[in-house]
């Protein structure tokens, strides 16, 4: 395990992402039953390879991911010692309100679903949904998060979203101890590398989510035609095919290389991988331990798309 930046939280290099457990077929293309979701969380808690669970108020209808996690936790008498759970505050799903008042209510809903009286890590989720001025206004989301921390309802604060420059703006406030972004440090996209390196050097915890680029690097572009939950570019798909072919020649699943690309980065504390079943938990642990020839890394790097195709191209 490694300390998550300067938080004092000790986490495993793998973190379980739980948005698939909310059963969102429109996003993932499949259903996950409540029973299956609870079994998946149980599989994580029963093992010793992963001690870190990531969720959010907004995962699924009426917070179904948190509710299902809460069922698993209650079945074990609460959050087991040594397990770190992070959740995120989200706007009101009906009105879109993302005020300070809503941030407080979001956490209250999460704590009720999870059966907890506090969380170890609380993220401001996808702040790109409002302006930076709104996010940092007096009485707004950031100020309210700081109040929740002072009140002991959240031990540590993070910011989790997409656009790297916006994440940098929020880190520069000095309130957030952890940063999470998704799909921006993968075999196909390096948008977040500078953000991650800078944050790591400042003692900020770095979480890299969606190392498979929304599934393309795990399933292949034929089965998963979208990159990063919606974007499709033929050049990116062609690069994924070339990478898969290179990995196949080396006798390695491309998914293993995609996952370990993040795990081997010295400036990433933990990599968030979505799981939908106990089998996927076991598969993820196995992929993390797969031996990869050194020569494959250089070949994969040579096949990566250029910066103009990244989600956040540099200026």
Indicate residue ranges for each PLM-predicted region.
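Acidic (Asp/Glu)-rich catalytic clusters
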Residues: 70-81, 111-116, 170-174, 198
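Conserved, mostly hydrophobic/aromatic
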Residues: 4, 16, 53, 69, ...
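Short, well-ordered coil/turn segments that N-cap beta-strands
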Residues: 9-14, 48-51, 79-83, 116-120, ...
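Active-site groove signature of glycoside hydrolases
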Residues: 111-131
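Acidic-and-aromatic substrate-binding clefts and catalytic sites of carbohydrate-active enzymes
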Residues: 56-66, 92-97, 130-133, 185-191
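Short, acidic/polar
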Residues: 30-44, 98-113, 163-169
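Beta/alpha (TIM)-barrel catalytic core signal, keyed to glycine-rich beta->alpha loops juxtaposed to Asp/Glu
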Residues: 127-315
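N-terminal binding-site loop/beta-alpha segment at the start of enzyme catalytic domains
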Residues: 1-83
């Amino acid at each position: 395990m490694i300390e998550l930046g300067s938080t004092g939280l000790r986490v495993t290099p793998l973190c379980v992402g739980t948005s698939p457990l909310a059963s969102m077929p429109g996003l993932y293309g499949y259903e996950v039953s409540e029973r299956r979701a609870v079994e998946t969380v149980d599989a994580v808690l029963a093992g010793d390879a992963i001690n870190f669970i990531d969720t959010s108020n907004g995962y699924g209808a009426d917070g179904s991911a948190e509710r299902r996690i809460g069922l698993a936790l209650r079945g074990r008498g609460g959050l087991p010692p040594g397990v770190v759970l992070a959740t995120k505050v989200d706007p009101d799903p009906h009105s879109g309100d993302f005020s300070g008042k809503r941030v407080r209510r979001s956490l209250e809903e999460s704590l009720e679903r999870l059966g907890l009286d506090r969380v170890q890590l609380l993220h401001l989720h996808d702040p790109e949904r409002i302006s930076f001025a709104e996010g940092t206004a007096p009485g707004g989301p950031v100020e309210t998060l700081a109040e929740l921390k002072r009140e002991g309802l959240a031990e540590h604060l993070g910011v989790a979203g997409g656009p790297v420059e916006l994440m940098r703006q929020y880190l520069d406030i000095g309130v957030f101890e952890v940063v999470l972004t998704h799909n921006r440090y993968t075999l196909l996209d390096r948008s977040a590398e500078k953000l991650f390196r800078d944050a790591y050097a400042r003692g900020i915890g770095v979480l890299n989510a969606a190392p498979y680029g929304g599934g393309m690097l795990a399933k292949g572009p034929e089965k998963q035609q979208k990159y990063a939950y919606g974007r499709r570019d033929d050049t990116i798909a062609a690069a994924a095919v070339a990478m898969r072919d290179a990995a196949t020649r080396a006798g390695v699943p491309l998914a293993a290389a995609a996952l370990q690309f993040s795990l081997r980065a010295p400036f990433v504390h933990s990599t968030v991988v979505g799981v939908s079943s106990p089998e996927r938990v076991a598969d993820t642990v196995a992929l993390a331990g797969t031996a990869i020839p050194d020569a494959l890394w250089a070949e994969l790097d040579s096949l990566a798309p250029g910066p103009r195709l990244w989600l956040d191209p540099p200026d």
